[in-house]
Amino acid sequence: MKKRISLLLIICMVGSIVFFFPKENTQEVKTVKKKQTPEISFYHQEYKERYDTYQKAHQDLSKKEVITLVNMNRDFDFYGKIIKQEHPNDLNTIVNKYYQLDETYEPSDLVEINTNAGTYGSSYSKHTARKVIYDDFQALKQACINKGFELYVTSGYRSTAWQKEIYNHMVETYSVERADETCSRPGHSEHTTGLGLDIALDQYKYEEVENHPQYSWFLSQLSNYGFILRYPKDKEELTGYSYEAWHIRYVGKDLAQKIEKSGLTFDEYYARNY
C-alpha cells in the first residue's frame, strides 16, 4: 500500500514539473529585410572618390546623374583629360573633347558617299565616308526622295591634318573659345572616324537645314537607318558643342534605336553602357 502511494506521489510530481516547465517557442521568427537601393550598373568602384567629390560640389544632382557625368569625365574641363581611343573602327566608338584619335588614324574602307550630284548637290559629289555607312545612307537617301526631297552629304571624312587647318582658321578668325564651341580640335573630330556626316536637304544648306519643311520627318527616320543626331539642341554642357541640326552620326540600327529610346545623348549613353 505504501509503495503504491509513493508511486502515485512520484507520478504527480513529475506531471507537475512537466506542466509548469516553459514550453519551447517553436513559432517561426520572420526576418524583415530592408529594401535596398537598386544597384547602378554603370557604377565603377575605382571612381568612388571622384563620384563623392562631384556629388559634394553638385548636391542638386541625383546619384545616377553624378555617376553618369563622372563617367563622361565632366568632372574635368573639356580637353582637361585626354583619353586615347583604342577602338576607332568600332561602330560605337566615341570621339569627343575627352576621347582622341591617334593622329595617324585613317579608315581603310573609305568610299564616295554621294552617288550623284542631284538637283542641288553638284558641289557635294566628292565627299567620302566609311563603306559600312554606304548602304544605309543610300536607303535613307531613297526614302527622302520618295518623300519628295533630296539628301546630300556636305562634309564626310576629314583627316586629322585637314581638321587642324579648319580649327586653326577658326581660332585665327575668332578665338579659341569661339572655335571650341563649333569646331573640334585635331584628333577629336567625329569626321575623322568616317562615321560622322554633315548633311543638306534640297537647297537648304547645312546651317539652314532645320528650316526644311520635312526636317522633323527626316529626324524621325534617322534611327531606322542607323543614324543619330549627334549634337542635339540644349545639350551643349553634355556634348561640348553647340546645337548642330546638320550633323548625323552612324552607329548602326540597333544602337541608334536604343539611343533614341533612352532619350540620352550619345555621350551619356556611352558613359552608362561602355
Predicted features, each with a name:
Residues 1-4:
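Positively charged n-region of N-terminal signal peptides that target proteins for export
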Residues 6, 14-155, 160-274:
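Extracytoplasmic cell-surface/polysaccharide-interacting catalytic and binding patches
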